[in-house]
């Protein structure tokens, strides 16, 4: 897995990311990381993201709202949404990114009423199993990973209250992305006041 962070100057050597783009080693479309004390900055990417708390707690900022994530709680971030994670000391989080096309028939039509939910669906166990599947790379592992995340997303969406998917970003999110794009284009001459 290759992570590319594009900073406000357009270089890929800093962590001031506005947009994350990753290239996978093979044809897999799912990735799972396990992190202790994770901190990242506000960013977005074209994959959906599922964050699950195994230990401790974390603040997850998602678009215009901050959620407190406790053990056995999860947050679902729709593709394209601006989000960040600030974990407390000794926290353990699983973070799963998956291609938005895998579950498009579900996630393009519906979204949970609230992105924060209790893990009544085996999210933590499934993400752990997915990590092993992706690391072992047995025959057909890509298809198996797609199937595992699809089954998990369907379970969550069947069990949580749903609403129609909103594909229009909030004004704050749109302005934030526009500001970062402007900073990209005018990095050398843009002043804090003008921004």
Regions found by a protein language model. Name each.
Residues 1-68:
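Generic protein-terminus/edge-of-domain signal
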Residues 61-65, 79, 88:
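Short strand-coil-strand connectors
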Residues 69-82:
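Conserved metal-binding segment of the jelly-roll/cupin
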Residues 80-102:
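Ligand-binding loop in jelly-roll beta-barrel domains
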Residues 98-113:
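Conserved segment of winged-helix/HTH DNA-binding domains
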Residues 111-119, 134-144, 154-194:
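Short, Lys/Arg-enriched, Trp-marked, Pro/Gly-tolerant hinge/linker segments that flank
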Residues 122-126, 148, 155:
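Amphipathic, well-ordered alpha-helical segments in soluble domains
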